[in-house]
Amino acid sequence: MIAPIDVHAVLQESVPGPYAALVTRPTGRAVRERIERAIADAPVAWMDFSGVRCIDYSCADEIVAKLLRTVEILLLKGVTEAHRLAIEPVLQGHNLAVVILTGTGLEVLGPPEAAALVCEELLTRRLAERTAGGTLALTAA
């Protein structure tokens, strides 16, 4: 089962006011705790960052890196280049990887060793398959 999460909606529920930015560690912690309750026992989570204006390193660490200790596979969509700039160094620092749905398919973000493990897990769970070009395509969401 894939647990879907609208990160912007969770942010709105977690922090008073019309915030669209994931900044500060306390904000990240509040959002992550709500997400953890929503995805309890789900091995795969799907997080949509559409509507999130920006995310800083501390929130990327609190949300993405710490959730990867809870779920086996984390799928992200609606990720902008600005989001990537905060998320990628956090993944590198923790030797973790996530799967990003892009306009052209799937991309695994993280160090090569962690990325290879995530790709293998996607194939094993039949969440993705290899295309004729050798890339991965999502089969379930």
Regions from the PLM with identified roles:
Residues 1-25:
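Extended, compositionally biased accessory segments flanking or bridging domains
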Residues 4, 45-48, 121:
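Preference for short coil/turn "hinge" residues that link or interrupt alpha-helices
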Residues 12-13, 82-84, 106:
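A short acidic, often aromatic-flanked loop/helix-cap motif at beta-alpha or helix-coil junctions
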Residues 19-44, 49-98:
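Amphipathic alpha-helical interaction surfaces in cytosolic regulatory modules
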Residues 79, 111, 133:
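Short, loop-centered acidic/histidine patches that primarily coordinate divalent metals
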Residues 92-116:
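Short amphipathic alpha-helical interface segments
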Residues 130-141:
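Short, cationic-aromatic polyanion-contact patches
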